Every structure is written in C-alpha cells, then in structure tokens.
Amino acid sequence: MFDYQQPDARGHFGIYGGSFVAETLSHALDELNAAYERYRHDPEFIAEFRNELAHFVGRPSPVYHAARMSREVGGAQIYLKREDLNHTGAHKINNTIGQALLARRMGKPRVIAETGAGQHGVATATICARYGMECVVYMGSEDVKRQSPNVYRMNLLGARVVPVESGSKTLKDALNEAMRDWVTNVENTFYIIGTVAGPHPYPAMVRDFQRVIGDECLVQMPALAGRQPDAVVACVGGGSNAMGIFYPYIPHEGVRLIGVEAAGEGMESGKHSASLQRGSPGVLHGNRTYVLQDANGQITETHSVSAGLDYPGVGPEHAYLKDIGRAEYVGITDAEALQAFHYLCRAEGIIPALESSHAVAYAMKLAKTMRPDQHVLVNLSGRGDKDIGTVADLSGADFYCRPSCRGQSVKGGDPSVVEIQRKAGGVQ
C-alpha cells in the first residue's frame, strides 16, 4: 500500500498549497482551520453530516455498469459513479453541506460562493435555503449566459447572483470577486469555496468532504465487479470531484488515477484549460499550484466548452500527485467531449454534464486499449440539464428553452401571476 499523509500542518502538498493571502484574511483562515480541526473529529458533527448526505442528498450514489457502452466501445468494462443522481444534480452538494455546518457552528449568518458551471452555486443556495442563511453567489457574466438555467435555480432558492464583468468574465474572475467580498465582510461571512483550491485549509477540507465518493466506491466496486477498478477517471478543473474519488484510492497502487483536463480547441491552439499539462508552478487564489501564465507571470486566458473546467489553475494536491507520479493527467477537446455527451445520451439514457463528458470521452479511449476483464471507473460528476442550451447551439439544433424565446406568451401569463412571481423574486 502506498503511504500517503498529505498535507502537512501548514497545508503544503510538497511545494504546493500553503496560504498566500492578504493580512486581513489571515485571522479568518486561522479561525476556520481551528474550527475544522475541532469539528472534523467531533462525533455530533460527523453524525449530522452523514445524516444530511443520506436523507437530504440521497447517498450513497450508485455505481452503474454501462454495459451497452462497454460492449460497443470494446475492451474494458466501464462503470459510472452516478454523482449526477445527487440532490441538485452533482457532487458539489457534498462539500457545501460540510462547510455550511461549519458556518453555523462558527456563528456566520452570511454565506458567499463562486461558481462556474453553476452547480456549486446551486448547491450553496440550496443548503443556505435549508439552513436559513443569507447567500450571495459570484458568477462570471459569460457563465451567467451559458448556464442560465442554474442562475434561475439560484434565484428560486433565494440566492443573489452577482454577475462579474471583469477579466475573462468566467470562474477565475468570480473567485477574485468572492475573495474581495470576504475581505470586506470577514466578521459575519463564511466563504464556501467549491473546489480543492484556495488557501489552506480549503484544499484539504473540500477533499475531506468529497472523499465520500471514493469511500463508497471502495465498497461498491467489489460488490458489483468483484474487485477494485484498474483505473479511475475523473474530469479536472479545480479538481474537487476528482480528488473526492481519487483520495481513498491513493494507497491502492494497482489502481491508475487519471485526471482529464479541458483541451478546448486543442493543446497547441492556446485555447484550453490544461494547467497541469501546459502550466507552470505559480500562486493563484491563495495557493501555490500549476497555473496557466505567461513569461511575466500574468494569468493567461483559458477556454473550454465546459464552464466548470474553464479555470487557469488546479487544486494543489493534483499538482503534487502529478509530480510524484501517483496520478496522470490527460486532455480531451471540446469536440471529443461533445461527442461523448451525445453518445452517452443515446447509448445509456444518461445526459451527462459537459464537465463529466470529458471524463467519459477519455474512458472510452482508454477502454479500447484494455482487456474485457479489466474495469474503468468514471466519476460522472454531474447531470447535463444545465448544458442542453449550449449543446443545442453548438450542434445547430432548433432548441428553445421556453415559448417566450419564440416571442410567444407563456400559458398562464396572467398579470396577477407575474406580480406574484415578481414579489417572490422570480421576475426582476
């Protein structure tokens, strides 16, 4: 078994991680770290967290043998860890519950979050509604446009969504604005970071809340397939779904861990988000990791068809796993991800998120190189309802999200109903 004890007491994964923040946030991070270290071993906290996962989220999520897909692709058997079946439609809810429980115990009534694909924003808004907490979500204006269904979900759940117009108007910029908010309102505000990035203790804390994914797989795979998988595949943007399934498997040296980054329009095009393959060590959002940057250390523009992978950095633990050779990282282009999206819809009746489609696409490639008695486990991190508008646009489909898109009135569009919606916050 591979001996793995990371991070160290200061939040370092080898040379990565740590805490590079303004002095105004140092106290808040120390306070958060102390609270996490206290409650992570507290039986009452653990019991409440597990109860919420079981009865609010619907865990454990199943592992599903994609038999038709395996047969048609050829080679190894492909299994899907169905995080798309969680309440809110992705893995993000696992982490938001853990952090919201911490926020309540720390007496922080206001919660902020950043979001790219919108799934972390929806998960945060959901748990804030459940616990009666104020919720503000920062989202790049480009992502607001391409993930509009999730923006409306957040509004329905009572969150205030703040479009970010600076920079590339995507996840990186949303995270910047959330950090600025936290500095200003640190006394009453808890920042729920959605991925395994940010300053210590966030990378380890988010990983620990997400490890339930891999812990379940350790039990489910032997029951379903007779043994552990030969390879575990997950998409990597910031990397929380990947760390969630990778972490429990790190000691199992016979299991390959493969992270799939967004190769966008191709690695040589410059239009991608593959920080582990094309980046270099640098500091971003409070931690040292692999970053896409120019010769002067300026963050470069990224691209992915998937909003959740459109990020110029990655969690520091992924950087460490790459350097020590325990995990490997590959790229999948927009075109390959879209092809896998459509294939999984038709072959298995599952509509995956575009983020997850990157992992599915690589798993299909990998399976072909393996024997039929081998197994590939894919973390299907989220469902694709949020992406159907984007996919329709890219495929040229005649898709309309609602009758009003065609200039038609909506059935039941009575003025009194609209006024009720307006008062409820549904119409701005």
From Swiss-Prot:
Coiled-coil regions listed in the entry: none
Domain of life: Bacteria
Swiss-Prot/TrEMBL cofactor(s): pyridoxal 5'-phosphate
InterPro entries: Trp_synth_b_CS, Trp_synth_beta, Trp_synth_beta/beta-like, TrpB-like_PALP, TrpB-like_PALP_sf
Molecular function terms, GO-annotated: tryptophan synthase activity
Listed SUPFAM superfamilies: Tryptophan synthase beta subunit-like PLP-dependent enzymes (SSF53686)
GO CC terms, sorted: cytoplasm
Keywords associated with the record: Amino-acid biosynthesis, Aromatic amino acid biosynthesis, Lyase, Pyridoxal phosphate, Tryptophan biosynthesis
EC number: 4.2.1.20
Pathway: Amino-acid biosynthesis; L-tryptophan biosynthesis; L-tryptophan from chorismate: step 5/5
Pfam families, A to Z: PALP
Enzyme class label: lyase
N6-(pyridoxal phosphate)lysine: residues carrying this PTM: K92
Catalysed reactions listed for this entry: (1S,2R)-1-C-(indol-3-yl)glycerol 3-phosphate + L-serine = D-glyceraldehyde 3-phosphate + L-tryptophan + H2O
PANTHER family the UniProt entry points to: TRYPTOPHAN SYNTHASE (PTHR48077:SF3), TRYPTOPHAN SYNTHASE-RELATED (PTHR48077)
HAMAP family: Trp_synth_beta
Family: Belongs to the TrpB family.
Reported function: The beta subunit is responsible for the synthesis of L-tryptophan from indole and L-serine.
Assembly notes: Tetramer of two alpha and two beta chains.
Protein name: Tryptophan synthase beta chain
Organism: Leptothrix cholodnii (strain ATCC 51168 / LMG 8142 / SP-6) (Leptothrix discophora (strain SP-6))
